[in-house]
Amino acid sequence: MTQNTKLRPITPEFDPWEAYMDVDQYGDMQLTNVEFTTTTLCNMRCEHCAVGYTLQPKDPNALPIDLLLKRLEEIPRLRSISITGGEPMLSLKSVKEYVVPLLKYAHERGVRTQINSNLTLDIERYEWIIPYLDVLHISHNWGTVEDFAEIGFAMMDRKPTFEQRARYFEKMIENSRTLVDAGVMVSAETMLNKRTLPHIEHIHRQITEDMKCQRHEVHPMYPSDFASALESLSLKEMRQAIHRLLDIRDENTWMLFGTLPFYACSPDEDDQKLLRRLRAAKNVTVRNDPDGRSRLNVNIFDGNIIVTDFGDTPPLGNIQTDSLPSAYEKWRETKLAKELSCHCPNVRCLGPNVLVKNSYYQDTDFTKRQARS
C-alpha cells in the first residue's frame, strides 16, 4: 500500500496551498485552488466544528460528477484541490462516485490533492484514495483520550460508549502511522483556544511522535457559526502560546501557522518580535490564507460557490450555471474583497482574511498600512 508519485515533494519551501505562489508565478492572485464539500455526514460532533450546523443524518442528491470535472477543466491555472465535509470518507458510495474521481482527475492533471478526514474509519477505506492523495489533513485538539471522547462528541445527542470512542482514538493514531508509511503527508491541525492551550505541548508530542505526522498546523480559533460559543484567545495570550510552541517544538517537523492575526504592518513591537522569530525558525512557515485569494468552495449538493465553507458571505454563483473563474472575478469586485486586498511584497504578506479582520481588526484599513519589518 504505497503512493506512487513523481511530483515535487511538498515541503516548507513548496506548499501548493500557499496563495503567494500565485503572485510569484503570475504577478497577482489567481484562482488556483478549489475546495469541494462532498458530504454532510459525520461520525463525530466536535464542539469546535466550523461546519457543525450543516451536518445531516443523510446526504442530499449530489450534482453529476461530470459537471464538477467540467468546472475544474475550465480553470487553466488549477494547482490544488481539497475535499472536505462532514467526514468525506464515511459513505463508501460517495467515496467511489465523487471523492475518488475528483482526486484521480486532479492527480492525473498534476494538481495537488488534500482531503480532510478524522481518520477514525477502517484503513481499508483510505486505500481507495492513497494512490491519488498528497495530503491527509486531520484536526487534532485532544490532550488525552478522555478529551477526545468528550470534545469530539460534545454536540452528539446519542453518543457511542466511552470504549467505542476510545477505540476511534486508537484507530486514528494507527491510521496516521500507516498512511505516513504509505507515502501520504499527514498534516494535523490544532486550534489555539482556551481548551487546547493547557495541553499544547502534549498535543504536539502526540502529533509528531505517536502519529508520525510530517506537519503540525496551528491555527487560532475564531468564533464561526457552530463553534461561536468557544472562547478565543486574546492577542496577548495567542502570542504567548506561539512563543511557547516554538520553545518546545520538534524542529525536524514542519510547523505551519495559518490565519495568524499578526502582521508586519503592526505598530505593536510584541507582534514584530514574534514575526521575526517565526521568520528565523527552522522548518516553520506562516501561510497566507487561501480563502478568497486563491480558493473558492463548491458544495456538490446545491452547487453553490462560496468563499469559504464556514463563512456567512452570500454565494458568488452556482456551478449549474456559472464557471468558477467567473465567480472568482465576481468575488474580486466585491466591497469585502477589496477591503481585504492588501499586499506587502517585501514580507510576502497578503493581509487578513474575513474571520481575522472581524475578530480583531474591524476598524483597521489594511490597505493604508505598510510592512515595518
UniProtKB/Swiss-Prot annotation:
Cofactor: [4Fe-4S] cluster
Pfam families in UniProt: Radical_SAM (PF04055), YfkB (PF08756)
NCBIfam families given in the database record: rSAM_YfkAB
Protein name: Putative protein YfkA
Residues reported in the UniProt entry to bind [4Fe-4S] cluster: C42, C46, C49
Disulphide bond pairs: none
Organism expressing this protein natively: Bacillus subtilis (strain 168)
Homology family: Belongs to the radical SAM superfamily.
InterPro entries xref list: Aldolase_TIM, rSAM, rSAM_YfkAB, YfkB
Lineage: Bacteria, Bacillati, Bacillota, Bacilli, Bacillales
Record's keyword terms, sorted: 4Fe-4S, Iron, Iron-sulfur, Metal-binding, S-adenosyl-L-methionine
Domain Radical SAM core intervals: 26-256
Domain of life: Bacteria
